[in-house]
Every structure is written in structure tokens, then in C-alpha cells.
Amino acid sequence: MKKLWKKGLVAFLALTLIFQLIPGFASAADSRLKDGGEYQVQVNFYKDNTGKTTKESSEADKYIDHTATIKVENGQPYMYLTITNSTWWQTMAVSKNGTRPEKPAQADVYQDRYEDVQTVSTDAAKDTRVEKFKLSSLDDVIFSYMHIKVDAISYDHWYQVDLTIDPSTFKVISEPAVTTPVTLSDGIYTIPFVAKKANDDSNSSMQNYFNNPAWLKVKNGKKMVAMTVNDNKTVTALKTTLAGTLQDVKVVSEDKDANTRIVEFEVEDLNQPLAAHVNYEAPFNGSVYKGQADFRYVFDTAKATAASSYPGSDETPPVVNPGETNPPVTKPDPGTTNPPVTTPPTTPSKPAVVDPKNLLNNHTYSIDFDVFKDGTTETSMMESYVMKPALIKVENNQPYVYLTLTNSSWIKTFQYKVNGVWKDMEVVSGDINKNTRTVKYPVKDGTANTDVKTHVLIEDMPGFSYDHEYTVQVKLNAATIKDITGKDVTLKEPVKKDILNTGNVASNNNAGPKLAKPDFDDTNSVQKTASKTEKNAKTNDSSSMVWYITLFGASFLYLAYRLKRKRLS
């Protein structure tokens, strides 16, 4: 009996542990939040890891509008939060997976566990801005990460806080009318679809690899979809979700000469997005890149049209309505999270003239640029640490500049100014072995001249220490812009000059008198610093660090010579 009791207790504890480790599935789809609905809630910031327990108020709670808005967009709830004193907020990010991340070992390297919020709007006069981020449930703690900088009192710190919602304040602003899902009777159809990214409503590049529309066969309530993969060599494997798991699709036929194949899979509910997974291979920089990606099929049942044939007996592809074109999407390009999947042109063509002020949606461009010292037309030493050319990618009608930085470990921050506020550039990718990373930032067009602020910290050179922030301008050279959509581009290493230099910048040890600081540090571990950062400090490329290195080397040789003579004597 005693052994039986012990076994039962062990089983109970094991089950308890398992359920604690499994994410809360109920909260992942909060029944109170309807697709297309808009809601209002009260929110609060609490000190790190106290949002569900002692609820210790954070100093950051004083700098938000406690009335937040929740909007459910294409099935995904988003919170819209207004922050005040917005010029102090350099960064705000939230946990990627909903759990509490460990504090980053290096404060500004957090992208593996936190995701930057999206700035929706800014009001410079009121010093406020509206931030947007994903939400799962009204009951979840939103684990947040922030960088607060107040120049007037030399305050600069990163810290973690808990953002919580008070469910009792939940208020419906608007909800869409209930619609009846379309039910198709038994028969054969063609059905248009859109390929969406896995975690948001933007179009996926996978759209270009499948002919549209697809075939649909409904028999006794069972729904089978068949479609043509139009790049058989690139798309090496495809899986779709059935009964909650990803399963390989069935290959109906293959045409190697045409580089196509027809695949078939079952769909349980045509009115819901279908999760899918693809493996692909693509030529990249002289080798073959193998990658994979998640995406979703969204079928338009309202536009399903009766057809006379279905693959298997008659493999004639369905006729595409000329009036319906595929959604404007583009294949992945170098520097993005999913590396490029490109189809080389069959015949060379003369490059089209590009209007730098009228860039086309879903196109990619290469462009040269200059990095100037702040407020001048003199080349900054920073140009020696950025690969060329830059890329401009137009995503959802918004152009973004992609820059690849070398000596990435030295460049701690790389920020651009938007509406008078410095904001971290999004890190797209990084290579620890090559010590590079690729960042992106939005621009108006291909003539942009962008203020950039960077923090350079060099600690890995014996006998030399460098720690400074300064501002430069990155000016795009509109005359060099080229449309390279669907093509690979080779980035060139910059010509290295001695090292990042400063000659006319303030010393790190000339701090002014200490002023009282707001207690943003909820863990009472403020990193006090005596550094004074000039807002518009310039790099002085004429004052080279070669002198320091030369003096260090000469001193070393002289000491070695003295020691040798002493031993001989």
C-alpha cells in the first residue's frame, strides 16, 4: 500500500510538472477577443517578475497611458500602447514566446529572446508615441525589455518589467457582425488562395512558387486540394497540417522538363488558414543554400468556381482568370531571415532606368552610399565598417535600407532618427564567425540622407580602450540605383583605415555634477557611469590611432632591448 501511494504521488508530481512546462493553450486563443474586434483595457507596469505575485509598481508605470487598445487583426490580437516622455524610450521589446526570458548578458543584444515593438504613430508636440505588439490573452503577463536614456541627467539603462492587463476593465469598442462560413457541395472547383507568413498577415514569398488558382475536390464532405509547384528544383519538400500535425503532401505527377510537379493534400476547414512548411534549395554566392520556412495558405471559398477536371484523370491546369492576379509579393533576397530563392533570367536584358523617388513595391534595389561626418561632406571613418552596396527593399510599399556592418562586436548600437527620436535599427541577420550583422531602417525613397547614431566600444585590443557615441549621415547615391529583383548581389568588403578615431570628442572622464536620477532600475543595479556623450560628436579621421600603436610598439621594443642587454651583462 505504501509503495502504491508513493507511485501515485510520483505520477501526480510528474503530471504537474508537465502541465507547468506546456504553454497555456487556452490563453493562446482568448474567447473574449473576436477577429476584427476592437477593445479597451487598463494596463500597468510592474517590476520584473512581480506582475503575477506581489505586483510591485515600476517607475516606468508613470510614463504610459494606462488605457490601452486591443485590436484583433486577421485572428491575431495586438495591443496598442501609448508611451509618454517618448524621447526617453530608446527601445521597447516584448518576449518572443510569451515566457519570461533571462536577462541578456549584453544589454543591447536581445533579439534572440525579445522582439521590438512596432511604432504606429508619433506626436512630437506631446512627446508621445503609440507602440504595437502581439498579445495572446488578457490574463498573460507581457514580459518586456526597455532601454531608457535621459541625457539631461546622464541616465542610461536597460531593464526588464512586467506589463499586465486588468481583465475586469475589459470593454468592447466594436465587434464585426457574425458571418456564416461558405460550405461547398460535392464537386470539382478551382479556388484562389494567398500564401501568408506564419505569424503575421503579410504576404509570404512562397506565393510565387505555386500556380494560382488551385484545384479543389469535395466528396462526402472531404476536401482535397491539388496545386502546381512551378519551381520543382527549388521547392524540395512541402508539408501541410492535418489532424494537428505537419504531413508530407502527395505528389500526383512531375514534369522535369518543365520543372514543375502537381501535389495534393487534404484540408479540414477551407475557411481557416492552413499551416504549411517548405524546404527549399537555392544558388547563393557560388554555392547551394538549403533553407526552410513556415507559412499559411488562405483559401477564398467565396470565389471558388466549378471546374470540369481534377488532377489524376485530367491534369490540365485550371484556367486563371486574367482579372485576378497573384498578390504582389517577392522572393526572399540576401540579408533577410529566409535567404534568397532566385530564378536566373533566361536571356540577358538591358537594365531599366530606375526612378529613385518612385520605387516599386516588392522590388529590391542595390545602391551606393556615403557615410559623412556629422553636418559635413567629409567621409567618416565609419564608412570603413559598412559593406557596399546597400540594398533597398520595398516591403508593403515602405522602402527599407539594408546595411551590412563589419567588426560587428565593436558596434554596440546603430540607430536612426525618426520624428526626432533615436530608434534602434532592426537586426536582420548576423554572422558571429565573420563578425558581421545586417540591419535595416525605413527611408522615404532612394535619395534619403539619414542621421545615424552609433556606440562604438573596443575592448579587445591590448593597451587600447575606446568607448564613444557619435553621429554620422548615411547619404544614398541615387545615381547608382539598380533594380536587382530576383538576382543575387555580392557585397564588397570596405577598405579598412587604421581604426575608428576621435580627436575632437569629449573624454569619457569629464562628467558634470551628479544629478538625482529617477529610479528606473527596478532591480537596484544601476550601472553608474561617468561618461559624457556629446549629442553631435564627430569622428576626427585625421587624428589616427596609429600614433598610439606606434608608441606602444616602440616602448615594447625598447624594453626588450634593455632586458636583453641586462642578461648579456
Curated annotation (Swiss-Prot):
Membrane topology field: Peptidoglycan-anchor
Binding site for heme: 204-205, 280, 289
Signal peptide (from-to): 1-28
Intervals of motif NXZTN sorting signal: 536-540
Gene Ontology CC: one annotated term: cell surface
Keywords in alphabetical order: Cell wall, Heme, Ion transport, Iron, Iron transport, Metal-binding, Peptidoglycan-anchor, Repeat, Secreted, Signal, Transport, Virulence
Region (Disordered): 307-357, 502-537
Inducing or repressing factors: Expressed in mid-log phase, cotranscribed with lmo2184, the second gene in a possible lmo2186-lmo2180 operon. Present in both exponential and stationary phase; more protein is expressed in log phase (at protein level). Induced under iron-deficient conditions and when fur (lmo1956, AC Q8Y5U9) is deleted (at protein level). Induced when bacteria are grown in human cell lines.
A Pfam family this chain is assigned to: NEAT
The NEAT domain, residue ranges: 34-173, 184-307, 360-484
Consequence of changing residue 280 to A: NEAT domain 2 no longer binds hemin
GO molecular function annotation: metal ion binding
Recorded coiled-coil stretches: none
Gene Ontology process terms (BP): cellular response to iron ion; iron ion transport
PROSITE patterns: NEAT (PS50978)
Disruption phenotype: Moderate reduction in growth rate at 37 degrees Celsius, reduced bacterial density in stationary phase (in strain LO28); no change in bacterial adherence to Caco-2 cells. 2-fold reduction virulence in mice. Does not impair iron transport. More sensitive measurements show that disruption decreases hemin uptake at low concentrations (0.5 uM and 5 uM; at 50 uM no effect is seen). Decreased hemin-binding and hemin uptake by whole bacteria at low concentrations of iron.
Residue ranges, compositional bias (Polar residues): 502-511
Taxonomy, superkingdom: Bacteria
Propeptide: 540-569
Localization, UniProt: Cell surface; Secreted, Cell wall; Secreted
Modification Pentaglycyl murein peptidoglycan amidated threonine occurs at: 539
InterPro entries reported in the protein's UniProt record: IsdA, NEAT_dom, NEAT_dom_sf, Sortase_SrtB_target
Regulation: Is overexpressed in mecA, clpC and clpP mutants, suggesting the protein level is controlled by MecA, ClpC and ClpP (at protein level).
Free-text comment about domains: Each NEAT domain binds hemin, whereas only NEAT1 and NEAT3 bind hemoglobin.
Annotated function: Acts as an extracellular and cell wall-bound hemophore; scavenges host heme and hemoglobin from the environment and also serves as a cell wall receptor for both. At low hemin (Hn) and hemoglobin (Hb) concentrations adsorbs Hn/Hb and presumably directs it to membrane transporters. Soluble Hbp2 can probably pass Hn/Hb to cell wall-anchored Hbp2, and both forms can accept Hn/Hb from Hbp1. May be involved in crossing the digestive barrier in infected animals. Binds host hemin. Binds host hemoglobin with affinity in the nanomolar range.
Name assigned to this protein: Hemin/hemoglobin-binding protein 2
Lineage: Bacteria, Bacillati, Bacillota, Bacilli, Bacillales
Record gene name: hbp2
